[in-house]
């Protein structure tokens, strides 16, 4: 999309199965703005601004809404981190307000805040429908001349004299001066084809969905990192997602060839400690039923940083992967800056 926007329209996108399959289709779609560095803050801020305008450009709804977000701190160390990040975010024009516990009650009154020492409120944070965002970007790219082919699996990377020269597919070769590995949780395998190390691995990622909550409205996204959880409204229900410290690796012997819009076997025993914390944090959950326990794969990197840029092993072979479950939040900015990176060279 961004290459075409910059005038480079001789671009082909190859998708092994269907667009949004793998992880995008089940992503939570949180679009925050407060990150731990200037570059990342700028990147995710751009994503939100892009998603806000995509529908007008493409005619496809992205489901993007600026609901605001609240991040709760249950200790002073966490609150200090929020204050530091808030100061950084303000440099890039991101409105971040540090609130007292009493002020937080006005934002998330149905949360138990007894042990909360403060928090961060970001009015322009939001959420989107990940699949719709992906399809809107695809339509925008096609409108500008990009060709997109589904059900085409890449089987090899062509190279010569230390530079990439194209890709091998099930249906033949495509010559190309530049190749970008956006393979998601398959990016490590695609990298191997090129002799490029892409250190990431899929983990099981869980979320719960409650029954409908009367009068819930469009609540802010709520993050409680000290309990490894986030909360958002989802069609009148509460979705509780987990980022547990001891995650479960998935597909250590390889991702199944036919994996597409698939779900992984759930593990209630693994999730129960976090579900109990969630019920304490949101007391109304005790009277609600849990309609869904979802388990799907997300890829993570060893240092929790993105894998983005030109590979050191092979010239003109770029990587954009390993977004550690915030791919929707990062995608707009990552696409923009990687496209500019490619063109600048």
Regions found by a protein language model. Give the residues of each.
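Helix-loop-beta segment of a Rossmann-like dinucleotide-binding subdomain
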Residues: 60-71, 105-144, 165-166, 254-262, ...
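Short beta-strand to alpha-helix junction loop
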Residues: 38, 42-45, 71-81, 120-143, ...
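Dinucleotide-binding Rossmann-like beta1-alpha1 core, especially the glycine-rich loop
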Residues: 29-107, 226-231, 235-237, 258, ...
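C-terminal catalytic lobe of FAD-dependent flavoproteins
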Residues: 130, 257, 265-345
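Helical element adjacent to the flavin cofactor pocket in flavoenzyme catalytic cores
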Residues: 119-178, 182-189
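Glycine-rich FAD pyrophosphate-binding loop
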Residues: 4-25
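Conserved FAD/dinucleotide-binding core of flavoprotein oxidoreductases
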Residues: 233-279
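Central helical "cap/lid" subdomain
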Residues: 169-218
């Amino acid at each position: 999309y961004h290459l075409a926007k910059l005038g480079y329209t001789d671009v082909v996108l190859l998708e092994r199965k269907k667009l949004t399959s793998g992880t995008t289709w089940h992503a939570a779609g949180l679009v925050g703005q407060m990150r731990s560095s200037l570059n990342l803050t700028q990147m995710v801020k751009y994503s939100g601004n892009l998603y806000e305008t995509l529908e007008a450009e493409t005619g496809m709804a992205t489901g993007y809404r600026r609901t605001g977000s609240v991040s709760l701190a249950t200790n002073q160390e966490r609150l200090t981190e929020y204050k530091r990040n808030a100061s950084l975010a303000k440099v890039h024009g991101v409105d971040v307000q540090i609130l007292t516990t009493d002020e937080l009650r006005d934002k998330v009154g149905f949360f138990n805040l007894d042990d909360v020492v403060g928090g961060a409120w970001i009015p322009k944070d939001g959420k989107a429908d990940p699949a719709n965002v992906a399809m809107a970007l695809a339509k925008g790219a096609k409108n500008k001349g990009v060709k997109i082919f589904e059900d085409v699996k890449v089987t090899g990377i062509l190279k010569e004299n230390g530079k990439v020269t194209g890709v091998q597919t099930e249906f033949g070769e495509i010559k190309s001066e530049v190749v970008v590995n956006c393979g998601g949780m398959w990016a490590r395998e695609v990298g191997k084809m090129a002799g490029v190390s892409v250190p990431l691995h899929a983990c099981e990622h869980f979320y719960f969905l409650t029954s409908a909550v009367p009068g819930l409205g469009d609540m802010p996204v709520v993050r409680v990192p000290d309990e490894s959880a986030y909360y958002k409204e989802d069609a009148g229900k509460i979705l509780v997602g987990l980022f547990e410290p001891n995650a479960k690796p998935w597909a250590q012997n390889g991702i199944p060839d036919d994996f597409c819009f698939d779900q992984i076997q759930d593990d209630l025993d693994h999730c129960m400690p976090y579900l109990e914390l969630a019920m304490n944090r949101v007391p109304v959950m005790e009277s609600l039923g849990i309609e869904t326990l979802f388990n799907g794969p997300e890829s993570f990197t060893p240092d929790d940083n993105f894998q983005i840029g030109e590979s050191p092993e092979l010239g003109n072979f770029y990587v954009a992967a390993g977004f550690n479950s915030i791919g929707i939040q990062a995608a707009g900015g990552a696409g923009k800056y990687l496209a500019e990176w490619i063109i600048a060279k």
